[in-house]
Curated annotation (Swiss-Prot):
Highest taxon above the source species: Bacteria
Outcome (variant: H75N): Abolishes enzyme activity
Source species taxonomy: Bacteria, Bacillati, Bacillota, Bacilli, Bacillales
Subunit structure: Homododecamer.
Pfam families to which the protein is assigned, alphabetical: Flavoprotein (PF02441)
Protein name: Mersacidin decarboxylase
GO molecular function: FMN binding; oxidoreductase activity; phosphopantothenoylcysteine decarboxylase activity
E.C. number: 4.1.1.-
One GO-annotated biological process of the protein: antibiotic biosynthetic process
Family membership noted in the UniProt record: Belongs to the HFCD (homooligomeric flavin containing Cys decarboxylase) superfamily.
Length: 194
């Protein structure tokens, strides 16, 4: 696959505390050859599932909630650095925060500081996904010009119940890349989407 429109772009990925965050390395490795540089910003709950140190092997830099050497990260600098900001996986919590302008962590504050729209890749179980409040938050994000790529139906192991069952999951890295490219092209065609 050759997506030359992205080759000189800087991609920022926000990682939230969904269990699917443990598979983020496959997305980072896949995206690596299509972007100039990839950086990651993580919530504390994401770091509880996969340490920032581990994620750093698959990208150019990781920003974590606690900062570096006692110094907090600037969400403004992080947001301005990125040409494209995606949140993979996006939890119901981050959808709710950002839809309502609430910024309780570095991932959410960076959405507010990023000069363009953000692309959200939600991942949660069916019970959460089908809640009216989640639908309302997604609708608000879209009204605000953000892009929400819906999860797909898959057979998945549900940790909460310890069973395999039909559920929701992230789209594959190759399809995620196509969604990012499409979102970027739309933004360049319609600057009002920023």
């Amino acid at each position: 696959m050759s997506i030359s429109i992205l080759k000189d772009k800087k991609l920022l990925i926000g990682i939230c505390g969904s269990i699917s965050s443990v598979g983020i390395s496959s997305y980072l490795l896949y995206f690596k050859s299509f972007f100039k540089e990839i950086r990651v910003v993580m919530t504390k709950t994401a770091e509880d599932l996969i340490p920032a140190h581990t994620v750093s092997y698959f990208c150019d830099h990781v920003y974590s909630e606690h900062g570096e050497n006692g110094k907090r990260h600037s969400h403004v600098e992080i947001g301005r650095w990125a040409d494209i900001y995606c949140i993979i996986p996006a939890t119901a919590n981050i959808l709710g925060q950002t839809a309502n302008g609430v910024a309780m962590n570095l991932v959410a504050t960076t959405v507010l500081a990023h000069p363009h729209n953000t692309i959200f890749f939600p991942n949660m179980n069916d019970l959460m996904w089908n809640k009216t409040v989640v639908s309302r938050n997604i609708e608000q994000l879209r009204k605000d010009g953000h892009i929400v790529i819906e999860p797909v139906e898959i057979m998945a192991f549900e940790i909460a119940t310890g069973t395999r069952k039909p559920n929701r999951g992230l789209i594959t890295p190759d399809k995620a890349l196509l969604a990012i490219e499409k979102g970027f092209k739309e933004r360049t065609k319609h600057p009002s989407l920023t």
